[in-house]
Amino acid sequence: MPVPASWPHPPGPFLLLTLLLGLTEVAGEEELQMIQPEKLLLVTVGKTATLHCTVTSLLPVGPVLWFRGVGPGRELIYNQKEGHFPRVTTVSDLTKRNNMDFSIRISSITPADVGTYYCVKFRKGSPENVEFKSGPGTEMALGAKPSAPVVLGPAARTTPEHTVSFTCESHGFSPRDITLKWFKNGNELSDFQTNVDPTGQSVAYSIRSTARVVLDPWDVRSQVICEVAHVTLQGDPLRGTANLSEAIRVPPTLEVTQQPMRVGNQVNVTCQVRKFYPQSLQLTWSENGNVCQRETASTLTENKDGTYNWTSWFLVNISDQRDDVVLTCQVKHDGQLAVSKRLALEVTVHQKDQSSDATPGPASSLTALLLIAVLLGPIYVPWKQKT
């Protein structure tokens, strides 16, 4: 503040002190900062919440008040000089001369207490104090952890190359901000939609997300993971999983082959059912359209990708077979329509000769008896007449 040139004499000590105090107050006002370190404060119903506020200067002279909200409709939360605030106490002693801590505690928190709180500095005035500076505000929100995510897959199985939907739900969290991600075998998915309800203010929120996944033939051992991250969680996010083995059906492939003749008049025919899932499978043999009950043996093996192979052996007696024998291997998998594979039996002349030389059947035995009767008949009759 410059000294007017019209003054005939230098100012006295009292005037200099007044000018110095004025300059100090202006500098203090310019340096004043209202510090509210927490942008978000998560609280629990029934507990006590502490709202921090410190100042960097005691100037200008005047009180510090607490409000919830801004504008004309803001709510007065605490005033040291006036009003009755039974649930609010100060952290420090505000009566101390050099106190710069105006933090408060609010006890018995209820859902109605959520909102943004501001500590505001007023300049002392007459007849009323004038608002001078406000802190940035601290949002108080009810902190509630989300429930463990639950992942649900499709109601029915689907074959590879088709798209299926998985849903993920989590409930009861607060505040509303939450992050949800989808993964398949560790790879993040992008085809999903997420909704958080309700859209307005609430005590607790729920999230629901639906992801679309294209099934691959090797997905029997695959997993989808729903990952939820929230400010109330300490450490890793929450995860829910679903196995694609519950959603996929891999249809089998069939192959019927005729093996070299094993013993005598028997031909071994093999039906190989490959790469199917799930395990439930029914296999039947038919010969020229007639269902056969006999089956020599069968084996079930599991592949590395989780699918299965089934091998069935069927023995055919060719000693009295015609040349037009057709064998059919029919498979009904997981309640689906049956699929089948046919094989026309090939019997060579050599195999027929082997079968006829192997073991005499009823017809050949009867022929031998008739020949013996014809040869021995004339001998038997004279011998009978002599006697």
Curated annotation (Swiss-Prot):
Keywords: Cell adhesion, Disulfide bond, Glycoprotein, Immunoglobulin domain, Membrane, Repeat, Signal, Transmembrane, Transmembrane helix. The chain crosses the membrane at residues 361-383. Residues 1-28 form the signal peptide. Its main location: membrane. Residues 146-245, 252-340 form the Ig-like C1-type domain. It is a single-pass type I membrane protein. Disulfide bonds join C53-C119, C168-C226, C271-C329. This is Signal-regulatory protein gamma. It comes from Homo sapiens (Human).
